[in-house]
């Protein structure tokens, strides 16, 4: 009942009076162009890195304030990207950035220094999605599970967005990523299998004739029994099934050079995202990519995401919480989460400018519970990597193969 209220209550009822006058609308904006310049063949990776659900100490929001704004050439280096294919071959694509307008640094939220050193803060506020009515429908059906232990989200008929560290540790690809698979949610019967077809026909043939030749009252009894079963079990059938996964191989993986640094420095948390192309297209409804607004333009300052937390085996876990701090590239938040949920797509629900309904879009990738350098002191945060105009343009290029459909986001 609580989930029903959350997802079917109009968005404006979740906003307090002070926010009623704010513009909570998706606004299309022109984004920079990212153009592929040249592609090089690289040596095949060894796929020997250990998968890490937590990145080593990184430069976070406070640390980034002390760094100079990256130049255009530095941005082009970070946004150049590696592609690793299912046969183990690897390429590097250099890009050029055009029509870039540098944006001012985001003002961070006050009072964000208070943290508790746990991934679950106080009372666990996560929801396990067990009801088939929710589990197999949008937006929960967009969540996927990676064979390396992370989560991800469907953003096209053939693409999954996830965290880069789920497949690459910054220096090499993790073990198991050469034969990476993605699990899409499906429901299975209690018996664990499908009903065999043709069983009625076989029974008729075994009995030696058409069952319509039997007494009429037997047929009526069977009809009545079927009705009783339907009436008694109809309300329970929704929750009878258990979630399982239909696994699909990954055709290729794209990772920004800002993360895949090799031996040329530490991976930058700002670029902890990757795109997976599936070998087979799916038929599920996917979630569109959006550009992350500021906290002030998020209803209640709230974000949402669903993933497969390791402490709840094979259960899809949903949560929503407020954002506590932001920079141009990162969001800090108090969402309760455990390892396994990293790579989940963080989304918002805002008004569609052309319609009266509210629409969900992905605005960040959950990077997980990270140790962040704050003025030389290590502190732990739950971090999400924002979809900026540049990252939107890059991911759009990965999906379409060119920038023709990536002018606005």
From Swiss-Prot:
Main location: secreted
Bias (Basic residues) ranges: 188-203
Annotated GO MF terms: serine-type endopeptidase activity
Record's subcellular location: Secreted
UniProt entry tagged with the keyword Secreted: yes
Disordered, as annotated region: 188-246
Cystines in this chain: 150-166
Peptidase S1 domain ranges (all copies): 120-404
Annotated signal peptide: 1-17
GO CC terms of this entry: extracellular region
PROSITE patterns: TRYPSIN_HIS (PS00134)
Family: Belongs to the peptidase S1 family.
Protein name: Inactive serine protease 35
Organism: Macaca mulatta (Rhesus macaque)
């Amino acid at each position: 009942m609580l989930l029903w209220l959350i997802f079917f209550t109009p968005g404006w009822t979740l906003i307090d009076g002070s926010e009623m006058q704010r513009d909570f609308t998706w606004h299309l904006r022109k984004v920079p162009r990212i153009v592929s310049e040249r592609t090089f063949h690289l040596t095949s990776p060894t796929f020997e890195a250990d998968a890490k659900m937590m990145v080593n100490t990184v430069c976070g929001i406070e640390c980034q304030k002390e760094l100079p704004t990256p130049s255009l050439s530095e941005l082009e280096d970070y946004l150049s990207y590696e592609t690793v294919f299912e046969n183990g071959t690897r390429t590097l694509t250099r890009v050029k950035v055009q029509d870039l307008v540098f944006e001012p640094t985001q003002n961070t939220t006050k009072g964000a220094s208070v943290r508790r050193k746990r991934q679950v803060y106080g009372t666990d506020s996560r929801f396990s999605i067990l009801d088939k009515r929710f589990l197999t429908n949008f937006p929960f059906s967009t969540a996927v599970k990676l064979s390396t232990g992370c989560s991800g989200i469907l953003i096209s008929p053939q693409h999954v967005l996830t965290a880069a560290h789920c497949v690459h540790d910054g220096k090499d690809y993790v073990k198991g990523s050469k034969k990476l698979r993605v699990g899409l949610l499906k429901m299975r019967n209690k018996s664990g299998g499908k009903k065999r077809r043709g069983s009625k026909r076989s029974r008729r043939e075994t009995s030696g004739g058409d069952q319509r030749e039997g007494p009429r009252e037997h047929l009526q009894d069977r009809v009545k029994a079927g009705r009783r079963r339907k009436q008694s079990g109809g309300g329970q059938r929704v929750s009878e099934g258990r979630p399982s996964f239909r696994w699909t191989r990954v055709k290729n993986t794209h990772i920004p050079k800002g993360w895949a640094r090799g031996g040329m420095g530490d991976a930058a948390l700002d670029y902890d995202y990757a795109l997976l192309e599936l070998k087979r297209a799916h038929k599920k409804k996917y979630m569109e990519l959006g550009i992350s607004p500021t906290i002030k333009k998020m209803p209640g300052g709230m974000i949402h995401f669903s993933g497969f937390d390791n402490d709840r085996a094979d259960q899809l876990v949903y949560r929503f919480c407020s954002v506590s701090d932001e920079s141009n590239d990162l969001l800090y938040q108090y969402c309760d989460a455990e390892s396994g949920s990293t790579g989940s797509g963080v989304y918002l629900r805002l008004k569609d400018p052309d319609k009266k309904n509210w629409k969900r879009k992905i605005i960040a990738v959950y990077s997980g519970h990270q140790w962040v350098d704050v003025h030389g002191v290590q502190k732990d945060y739950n971090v999400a990597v924002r979809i900026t105009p540049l990252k939107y343009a890059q991911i759009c290029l990965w999906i379409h193969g060119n920038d023709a459909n990536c002018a606005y986001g």
